[in-house]
């Protein structure tokens, strides 16, 4: 256990000092953010604009993550799998907020898809999830009774296609980005989410340290934003 904790500390220290991939460090990301947290529990308890009832679902989410991770069928590379904090955040917020419409970009092996769908299945509103990916095999990432809508994007015409698909949908309550983490796509998607979200809606982004897009847009276009550590990267949460 001690060696495991030490390894996590070293990874997080490296993120503090150097950033990840293209060198987007925590110092750059933190400018203008409303708070930086080690996990979902401390975030929810500290921030008044996030639903306190989400804390009631954290243990449930963590147990479910272990189950989903073991049982989930591999359809793409495992390195694209979401990690525990993102899974927990999504499950807890979807349970607490009872959203009607959720958008997810990037399905991979369906870890986040299952977090959202298993929460929606239990909610009174029986909300719907619209998931977008360029890989046809990811359409098999979720099998269940909930209202899941998979949208296959053409990799040669992704920008135009996703805009066309989104404009057909109602306003969005929660938007989850976990697809292309390059600067151009992240900036495009964050702005599309901003336009599509209801007032008070939530944008959640994995890998905000992959480009400078989050640092630029979260402070200038959203009302509040927060950062959570995951074991290898940062998660961003922004409120419209």
Where are each of the predicted segments found?
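A short alpha-helical cap/connector motif
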Residues: 1-176, 180-240
